[in-house]
Amino acid sequence: MSNEQEDFGSLFNNQGELGIMDDFAEFGFQTTTTPTNWAAAGNYMYPDQVHLPASINNPNMPINDWLEDAPMPDCYNVPSTSTDENNDPFPFSNISSQSSLKPKTPEKAVVEVRPTGNEMLDPEPKYPKEEKPWCTIFYYELTVRLGKAFEAKVPTITIDGATGASDECRMSLTSQPSSRNSKSSQIRNTVGAGIQLAYENGELWLTVLTDQIVFVQCPFLNQTLNKPLKYVFRLQNKGDQKRMKIFDKEQFEQEKTLALGPLTEKEVADERMRIFSNIRVSFCKGFGETYSRLKVVNLPCWIEIILHEPADEYDTVFRINNERPEIGSRS
């Protein structure tokens, strides 16, 4: 018999039962024959220096009683759950039989984690991000702003005079409060299909759908066409006159470059950028130098469109220009 076999054989007593090594005596344990049901350990090697309570060898105390008051692991520490369900000190002794352990899980999972390909697991729940509006529209009668602001979050919207409440794709002028001005009410009732705004790939297009004439004041468009910033366009639902591009991001980037350029150019570009985010549309009634009403605030029914992207860009440019040191002088 080899030395290895002799060492392994010394673990058993004369009856072939697994005994406790003499090395345990220094820990205050009695070296006596263990219960016969431990023989089911088979070829499992006994762990070195295992701290076993002396009560485990007491023939008058069941082997399971010594763990009766032992704290359970956190994953099984469920209120009103008996610790007897997990009290076997050496679970491998019953490896051949099906375990009676029935761990309890919460009734509702707080976070559900699922693998997503090669990406790392993210334990935080994900919620769809709220889509930001690309423009805000206000309704006016003369100088009075009425109703709630309309925020456009979908690429294409309409502003019309049809009945019914507004929704994410449509702003209804008839659903807005009225200033009780008879002219305003009359115009609102004739707006009909109104206008359409379509914003895609950095371009904003306005299309006339109503049979009425629409007047548009767009400083950015006037700048690109070398017209006075207060110039007013007259559109109607006929041929080429019904559709017009009123904003272009690429053109706007060029103006932003000027605003960040030398001081002499920056002073002019700053003022222009400030109004490039504003578009004013009047229904039925015109205004401007060729009309009796010079300003849009003299009209009974009109809307103001605020484009968020150029407005945010202006805020950024304005902050940068005010933070950096200026070279030159203002006169």
UniProtKB/Swiss-Prot annotation:
GO terms for molecular function: DNA-binding transcription factor activity, RNA polymerase II-specific; I-SMAD binding; RNA polymerase II cis-regulatory region sequence-specific DNA binding. Residues 175-185 have a biased composition (Low complexity). Residues 134-331 form the MH2 domain. One of its GO terms (cellular component) is heteromeric SMAD protein complex. Changing residue 286 to E: In sa340; constitutive dauer formation at 25 degrees Celsius, an egg laying defect (Egl), abnormal social aggregation - also known as clumping behavior (Cpy), and a dark intestine (Din). Keywords: Transcription, Transcription regulation. GO terms for biological process: anatomical structure morphogenesis; BMP signaling pathway; cell differentiation; dauer larval development; determination of adult lifespan; egg-laying behavior; negative regulation of dauer larval development; pigment accumulation. InterPro entries: Dwarfin, SMAD-like_dom_sf, SMAD_dom_Dwarfin-type, SMAD_FHA_dom_sf. Residues 168-187 are annotated as: Disordered. Probably an atypical receptor-regulated SMAD (R-SMAD) that is an intracellular signal transducer and transcriptional modulator activated by TGF-beta-like daf-7 signaling. Plays a role in TGF-beta-like daf-7 signaling in regulating entry into a developmentally arrested larval state known as dauer, in response to harsh environmental conditions; partially redundant with R-SMAD daf-8. PANTHER family: PROTEIN MOTHERS AGAINST DPP, SMAD. Interacts with R-SMAD daf-8 and co-SMAD daf-3. Interacts with daf-3 in a daf-8 dependent manner. This is Smad-related protein daf-14. The lineage of its organism: Eukaryota, Metazoa, Ecdysozoa, Nematoda, Chromadorea.
